[in-house]
C-alpha cells in the first residue's frame, strides 16, 4: 500500500513539473532576420484521433518556412503519413494559402488537427508580430 502511495505521489509530481514546463515555454520567439517561431502547445488543443497535435511553426515575411510536429499521442502508423505527406506541403506557402491544403484520406482527424494548429499559429503571429 505504501509503495502504491509513493508511486501516485511520483506520478503527480511528474505531471505538475510537466505543466510548469509548459507554462515556461514561450509561444512565440523572434530570431534574427525576421524569423518567428511559434509553438502551438498552449495555443490549440484540437485533438486528432487520440490527442492534441502541437506544432513548431517557423514563419518569415508572412510565409511558412517550416512546420515540425511536436510530441503527441497519435497512432504512429497514421501520424507518420502526416509528417511525411501533409506537413511538408505547408513549407513555402503564404499564410493565407494554408487553408487550401487538403487533409489526408485515412488520417482525416489528425490532418484537421494539424490544420487547426497552423491556423492558431497564424492568428497568434498576426496579432503579436
Predicted feature residues:
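Positively charged n-region of N-terminal signal peptides that target proteins for export
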Residues: 1-4
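Terminal accessory regions that mediate trafficking to/through membranes and regulate activation
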Residues: 6-8
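Flexible, solvent-exposed loop/hinge segments and secondary-structure transition points
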Residues: 19-112, 122-129
Amino acid at each position: 500500500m505504501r509503495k502504491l502511495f509513493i508511486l501516485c505521489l511520483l506520478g503527480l509530481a511528474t505531471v505538475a513539473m510537466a505543466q510548469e514546463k509548459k507554462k515556461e515555454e514561450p509561444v512565440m520567439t523572434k530570431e534574427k532576420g525576421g524569423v518567428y517561431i511559434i509553438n502551438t502547445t498552449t495555443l490549440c488543443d484540437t485533438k486528432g484521433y487520440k490527442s492534441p497535435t502541437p506544432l513548431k511553426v517557423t514563419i518569415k515575411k508572412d510565409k511558412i518556412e517550416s512546420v515540425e510536429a511536436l510530441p503527441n499521442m497519435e497512432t504512429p502508423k497514421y501520424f507518420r503519413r502526416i509528417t511525411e505527406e501533409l506537413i511538408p506541403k505547408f513549407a513555402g506557402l503564404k499564410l493565407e494559402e494554408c487553408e487550401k491544403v487538403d487533409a489526408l484520406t485515412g488520417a482525416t482527424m489528425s490532418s484537421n488537427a494539424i490544420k487547426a494548429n497552423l491556423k492558431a499559429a497564424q492568428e497568434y503571429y498576426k496579432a503579436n508580430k
